Amino acid sequence: MTRIRRGYIARRRRTKIRLFASSFRGAHSRLTRTITQQKIRALVSAHRDRDRQKINFRRLWITRINAAIRERGVCYSYSRLINDLYKRQLLLNRKILAQIAISNRNCLYMISNEIIKEVSWKESTG
C-alpha cells in the first residue's frame, strides 16, 4: 500500500490548535497531544466558570443590598425588601438595587421606606 501524505490539511489543523495554546507554559504549548487535552480542559473550565460568575455576582449583589438595608433598621432585611418589592410589583432587579446601595444610599432608604409604608398600610386596612 502506498503512503499517503496528509499535506497541508493536518498542518493547518495543528497550527490552529497551537495558536490557541500559544500562551500556555511548557509542553502544553509545544506537544500536539497535550495541547488538545489542555484546549478541551480550558474550554470546559471557561464554560463552567461563566455560570459560576453569574452565581457569584448575584451573591455579591445580595450581600451589598442586605448590608445597606440592615444598616438602616435592625428589623428590616433583604428578604423582606425583595418580598415587599414583589408585592408592590416594582421591577428593580438585584443588580440595580446593589448599584443604588453603593452610589446613593439615601435613594435606597427612600425606596425601602416607601415600600414599608405601602405594605404596612395595606396590611392595616385589610
Swiss-Prot record:
Q: Which PANTHER family match?
A: 39S RIBOSOMAL PROTEIN L20
User: Which GO biological process entries does UniProt record here?
Assistant: ribosomal large subunit assembly; translation
Gene that this sequence comes from = rpl20
Q: Which species is this UniProt entry from?
A: Guizotia abyssinica
Q: Which family does it belong to?
A: Belongs to the bacterial ribosomal protein bL20 family.
Q: Which InterPro entries did the record assign?
A: Ribosomal_bL20, RIBOSOMAL_L20_CS, Ribosomal_protein_bL20_C
Alphabetical keyword list: Chloroplast, Plastid, Ribonucleoprotein, Ribosomal protein, RNA-binding, rRNA-binding
Quote the Gene3D superfamilies the UniProt record gives: 6.10.160.10, Ribosomal protein L20
S-adenosyl-L-methionine: is it a keyword of this entry? no
Q: What is the protein's name according to its record? A: Large ribosomal subunit protein bL20c
